[in-house]
From Swiss-Prot:
Disulfide bond positions: none
Subunit structure: Homodimer. Interacts with EssB.
Keywords: Cell membrane, Membrane, Transmembrane, Transmembrane helix, Virulence
Annotated TM spans: 7-27, 822-842, 869-889, 903-923, 928-948, 979-999
Record membrane topology: Multi-pass membrane protein
Protein name: Type VII secretion system accessory factor EsaA
Gene Ontology cellular-component terms listed: plasma membrane
Organism of origin: Staphylococcus aureus (strain Mu50 / ATCC 700699)
Family, per entry: Belongs to the EsaA family.
Subcellular location(s) per record: Cell membrane
InterPro entries in alphabetical order: T7SS_ABC-Transporter, T7SS_EsaA
Length: 1009
């Protein structure tokens, strides 16, 4: 067993030795070449010095223009042939300094452009161009790089001075352009003042002159009109219009006589007509005819029983004769004739269908129409499903049955519309299979747009109405509490007095014992409260009537009167009207189109079946030819049926005795009525007596009024003439007034136009003044700090002559050209290998001797835990001692400056403790797997070191734990980044490693994999 363990130990030792030798060879090759490069760079030319440019400059604005001096600096260096420049990020530049890819890193700071454009500042701040040289170079190489940086800085200062001079000249040119623009604006204002305002004002008095002339003319015409009218009225005689009512006009008398004669003549004519009609009517003939008809009916009634058998016999004979004639008929078509006709008819129809151009054109037209109809249906179905941007309301949401029920539909309607949605999905899948990916369609996602549409509540609101009558003796205050989700408009009336609907307390009149409360208003949902409102979908308004400032006494048994009038409106029904209606309409429209689509699908390409059509037509003709026999049999059946029903028909004809009796009674009544009329005609009518003598009284009436009516007519004619003259004058006055009104309107319009033009001119002048003031203000700022009193501003002069200064980012590592330094990469590698050896020593001891027990477990059950703590402490202390020794040696090798040594030693100690604790835990717990993980971490570090190029860092550098330790020491030695966070992380890792070593689980069977 011991021999086997020694074999395992020998294998592990050989692996470690091979790793160390490989590492030394790799480092010697890599960093030896770098050392040779450093020694050769002393004798090389300047173009062998690689300079990394890090541009962190942010653009700024100067005189309204964007300025990026960092980019200008880089473009300037791009044309430089003496040095080799590359623009990279800060991380790439630092990595290049680390592995020898770059000798100098120049950093353009973030505020470079802003500080460079301080031409208007009185005491401008200096600009610092930061740079850093590679660590560990020879003294001569370091001096050469310093010289390169100085040359680059001097060149850029010259370029920057040229930029300043160009900026000053541009400002002067802008000032010259602005002065010209000011003169142009002033000329434009003067021209507009002359055309817009001055000339119209000069023409303005002419409008007043025209108005005055029209007014004078209208006044004259009005005066003339009134004079003429007054003259006409004064010349009229009032007696002229008086009529003597004691007399009637002769024309009235004549008309009355004529009317009387007409009535008398009409009466005579009516009497003559009556007499003539009485003589012409032959009532006897009518009466005799009716009596004869009555006797015939009696005769027919008596013959009913004797004629029935004769009717039956006659009908039977006729039917038998018809049956014999039909049975004797034979079919004119034989079977062979029918078959020949079938063949000929088929050939004829086939030839007609094949050669008929009109039929072919009709079939092609039908086919094209079907294709166009199918295409239109597909487009309509696409529009029904897809939602177009902004304006489309006819689209389909991807809703389920539960969504429809939540929107207010019953279960039957929800099932109906859910089936339509499934049809839409089915059609969508068929459509997408036929179309490319870019033309695929989808149903619009549903997010309660139908069930939670609050647009009507936001725009229209909900009415709030309530009427209550409250009776109480001690109520003196009203408290109103509104729903915070709504804006209320309206009022609350209490006994006729109005109060706004808002959160408030109102003192009531205590003299009233009865309060009539009326609430009338509108509550509109707030847009920002929509989400909270949808939780309960209820609007609340509370009116609380009570007592103010009442202190309840302990012995006061009288209860305080409180009346709560609360309005709660559940608005769930107001949320889905418009949106739900639109969605159901869209679904119904799609359903109709989809049914048409399924009916026509597959028929557009189906060929026309000519053979089937021909067979159908021929079969129809042949069936008609062969149906002769069947038709003959059918006619015979009808004759048999008529014979069977003949008895019933005869009985119906002969058994109408009841109707005959009724007719006989009606005829008897008619005969009696005609007998009475005959008696009336036999009597002579009595003629009325008319007293024609009274008509003479009308003839004696006087017509003396005719003369006075003639005189009235003459006066009325004269009055009409005067009225026509007045009308002519009035028309003239109206025309003058209309002209006057037009002049006034024109005057008003001209005044308004002048006002508008004056306002436009005023605005333009104000804008010009503002532009001129802005120019004067900006021009005043140009080089306003160029002088300090009467002397030149020395600070500004010094800044403009040498604006950019260089700033060296100090390195922690002493730059001694005569001393070789060790790289942080090799330093980290040595620490890790030392920790692996230490971890393997602890692991080997534990395998050989067992777990270290400093305290016997028999004394206490907690002694095992104390032994684990002591073991972890021993491992950690070992790492601490090794870290202290390695740190002191490395401090001298790196020549760390005095102020940085303590932190450097602390970093080395913590790093060494982390390496020792973690590696020891891996070997103690997972053994060979732990060894594999340790070697894997080492291998990742080798790969990461090999992939460190100036262009960037590889993925392995990001996942390698040792690379982070390497970067930590490199950044600290170059004074780049603070190490506070790194020390905290290392401390946490030390604690974790210490705790892990306390809880080692030993398995019964141990072996190397």
């Amino acid at each position: 067993m011991k021999k086997k363990n020694w074999i395992y130990a020998l294998i592990v030792t050989l692996i470690i030795i091979i790793a160390i030798v490989s590492m030394i060879f790799f480092v010697q090759t890599k960093y030896g070449d770098q050392s040779e490069k450093g020694s050769q760079s002393v004798s090389n030319k300047n173009n062998k010095i690689h300079i990394a440019i890090v541009n962190e400059d942010q653009p700024t604005t100067y005189n309204g223009k964007k300025v990026e001096l960092g980019q200008a600096f880089i473009k300037r260096l791009a044309n430089e042939k003496n040095y080799k420049f590359e623009t990279v990020t800060r991380n790439v530049a630092e990595s290049g300094l680390k592995n020898g890819g770059y000798q100098v890193m120049i950093v353009i700071p973030e505020n470079f452009s802003k500080l460079a454009m301080q031409l208007d500042a009185k005491t401008p701040s200096k600009i610092s161009l930061q740079y850093k040289t590679a660590v560990g170079q020879k003294e001569e190489v370091a001096k050469n790089t310093e010289k390169v940086v100085s040359n680059v800085l001097n060149d850029f200062n010259k370029n920057l001075v040229e930029i300043y001079l160009t900026s000053i000249i541009d400002n002067l040119h802008n000032a010259q352009k602005n002065v010209g623009a000011i003169m142009t604006r002033e000329h434009g204002v003067n021209s507009k003042f002359s055309n817009y305002l001055l000339n119209p004002i000069n023409d303005f008095p002419e409008l007043f002159t025209d108005t005055l002339v029209n007014s004078i003319s209208a006044n004259k015409d009005i005066t003339k009109w009134f004079q003429t009218y007054n003259k006409s009225l004064l010349s009229a005689n009032s007696d002229t219009f008086r009529v003597n009512t004691d007399y009637n006009v002769s024309t009235l008398i004549e008309k009355q006589n004529s009317l009387f004669d007409e009535h008398n003549t009409a009466m005579d004519k009516m009497l003559q007509d009556y007499k003539s009609q009485k003589d012409s009517v032959e009532l006897d003939n009518y009466i005799n005819a009716l009596k004869q008809m009555d006797s015939q009916i009696d005769q027919q009634s008596s013959m009913q029983d004797t004629g029935k058998e004769e009717y039956k016999q006659t009908v039977k004979e006729n039917l038998d004769k018809l049956r014999e004639i039909i049975q004797s008929q034979e079919s004119p078509f034989s079977k062979g004739m029918i078959e020949d006709y079938r063949k000929q008819l088929t050939e004829s129809l086939q030839d007609e269908l094949a050669n008929n151009k009109d039929l072919q054109d009709a079939l092609n037209s039908i086919k094209m129409n079907n294709a166009q109809f199918a295409e239109n249906l597909e487009k309509q179905l696409h529009d029904d499903i897809v939602k177009e941007p902004d304006t489309d309301t006819t689209f389909i949401y991807n809703m389920s049955k539960q969504d429809f029920i939540a929107a207010g539909l019953n279960e039957g309607e929800a099932n109906k519309y859910e089936a339509i949605v499934k049809e839409a999905k089915r059609y969508k899948n068929e459509y997408n299979l036929k179309k490319p990916l870019a033309e695929h369609i989808n149903l619009t996602d549903y997010d309660n747009q139908v069930a939670q549409d609050t647009s009507s509540l936001i725009n229209d609101g909900v009415k709030v109405q309530r009427t209550e009558t409250i009776k109480s003796n001690d109520i003196n205050q009203l408290t109103v509490a509104t729903d915070p989700h709504f804006n209320f408009e309206g009022d609350i009336k209490i006994n006729g007095k109005k109060y706004d609907i808002k959160d408030q307390s109102v003192q009531l009149d205590t003299s009233n014992k009865e309060y009539k409360v009326e609430v009338n208003g509108v509550a509109k949902l707030k847009k920002d409260a929509e989400k909270d409102f949808l939780k309960d979908k209820t609007m609340h308004l509370q009116l609380l009537f009570g007592q103010a400032n009442r202190q309840d006494e302990p012995n006061d048994k009288k209860a305080t009167s409180v009346v709560d009038v609360t309005l709660n409106h559940n608005l769930d029904g107001r949320l889905s009207k418009d949106a739900l209606s639109q969605q159901l309409s869209a679904l119904s429209r799609f359903d109709a189109h989809y049914k048409m689509y399924t009916d026509t699908k597959g028929r557009e390409d189906k060929p026309f079946d000519n053979k089937r059509l021909i067979d159908m037509m021929v079969d129809q003709v042949i069936n008609d030819m062969e149906s002769f026999k069947d038709d003959k049999v059918a006619v015979l059946h009808q004759i048999d049926s008529m014979e069977e029903n003949s008895d019933k028909l005869i009985d119906d004809i002969l058994n109408n005795k009841k109707n005959t009796t009724k007719n006989k009674e009606d005829i008897s009544k008619l005969i009696d009525q005609l007998e009475n009329v005959k008696k009336t005609f036999a009597e002579e009518p009595q003629e009325p007596k008319i007293d024609k003598g009274k008509n003479d009284e009308f003839n004696t009436m006087s017509s003396n009024l005719d003369k006075e009516i003639s005189r009235i007519s003459e006066k009325s004619t004269q009055l009409l003439s005067d009225t026509q003259e007045s009308k002519t004058i009035a028309d003239s006055v109206s025309g003058q007034l209309n002209q006057l009104d037009n002049n006034v309107n024109k005057l008003h319009a001209t005044g308004r136009a002048l006002g508008v033009r004056a306002n436009d001119l005023n605005r333009q002048m104000a804008k010009n003044d503002k532009d001129n003031e802005l120019f004067a203000k900006e021009f005043k700022k140009v080089l306003q700090n160029s002088k300090d009193g009467d002397r030149q501003n020395q600070a500004l002069k010094a800044f403009m002559s040498n604006p950019v200064q260089k700033k060296n980012l100090e390195n922690v590592l002493a730059n001694n050209g005569n001393t070789e330094v060790i790289s942080p990469t090799l330093f980290v590698l040595l620490m890790y290998l030392l920790s692996m050896i230490t971890a393997y020593i602890f692991y080997s001891y534990e395998r050989a001797k067992g777990q270290m027990n400093f305290i016997k477990d028999d004394y206490s059950s907690k002694n095992h835990l104390w032994n684990n703590v002591i073991t972890s402490g021993v491992i950690g202390t070992t790492g601490l001692v090794e870290g202290l020794i390695v740190g002191l040696i490395a401090m001298n090798k790196f020549h760390v400056l005095a102020g940085y040594r303590a932190k450097f030693i602390l970093m080395v100690i913590l790093t060494m403790m982390v390496f020792v604790l973690i590696n020891t835990y891996l070997l103690r717990q997972v053994k060979s797997i732990g060894m594999f993980l340790m070697i894997a971490a080492l291998g990742l570090y080798f790969v990461a070191m090999n992939n460190l190029k100036a262009a960037g860092q590889g993925v392995t550098n990001k996942i390698s734990p040792l690379s982070y330790i390497d970067n930590m020491f490199f950044n600290y030695l170059n004074a780049e980044h603070p190490i506070g966070l790194a020390l905290v992380i290392l401390t946490v890792l030390v604690i974790i490693g210490f705790v892990l070593n306390m809880f080692i689980k030993h398995f019964k069977k141990e072996r190397l994999i």
